């Protein structure tokens, strides 16, 4: 490995789908598009059945995980950063966000030609066992993380 070959002290973090108020205007990921629409009071639009299952982690939890890895991780090891309680399909993610924002989920399914550019990954779930062995635990469920995100980005958190 690189660590052994060059005698460096390094650890690796493999982040799952990280979400939160850190989303940028140029972010084109589906979850960022859902969030922008929900904040605008518009329906969340799915471009697929939303059956793909992913691990999610709220940005504040991910930051804490990175700190745990930096302080306690073993050199040469890789750690999955994921919340084992926040595994959901894209549709479940969208429905949770829509419910919190008071909007609906609608579908705009692409043509076969358009679908060719879409991801074919159906399951992207990470196990955070090694990270949890360092003592790290997430503080936010998917719903809590989305609720905090909406409050922060809408300015409610400042009131």
Regions inferred by a protein language model and the residue ranges of each:
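A short C-terminal helix-loop "cap" of Rossmann-like NAD(P)-dependent dehydrogenase/epimerase domains
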Residues: 34-46, 99-112, 129
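Mid/C-terminal beta-alpha module of Rossmann-like enzyme folds, strongest
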Residues: 72-116
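Conserved beta-loop-beta element that borders a ligand/cofactor-binding pocket
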Residues: 1-22
């Amino acid at each position: 490995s690189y660590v052994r070959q060059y005698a460096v002290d390094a650890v690796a973090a493999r982040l799952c789908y990280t979400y939160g108020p850190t989303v940028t205007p140029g972010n084109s990921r589906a979850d960022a598009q859902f969030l922008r629409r929900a904040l605008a009071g518009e329906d969340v639009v799915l471009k697929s059945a939303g059956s793909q299952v992913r691990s999610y982690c709220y940005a504040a939890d991910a930051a804490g995980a990175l700190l745990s890895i930096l302080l306690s991780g073993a050199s040469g090891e890789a750690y999955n950063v994921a919340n084992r309680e926040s595994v959901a399909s894209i549709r479940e993610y969208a429905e949770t966000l829509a419910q919190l924002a008071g909007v609906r989920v609608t579908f705009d399914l692409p043509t076969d030609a358009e679908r060719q550019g879409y991801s074919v990954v159906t399951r992207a779930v990470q196990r955070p066992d090694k990270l949890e062995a360092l003592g790290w635990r997430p503080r936010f469920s998917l719903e809590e993380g989305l609720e905090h995100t909406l409050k922060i980005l809408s300015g409610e958190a400042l009131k």
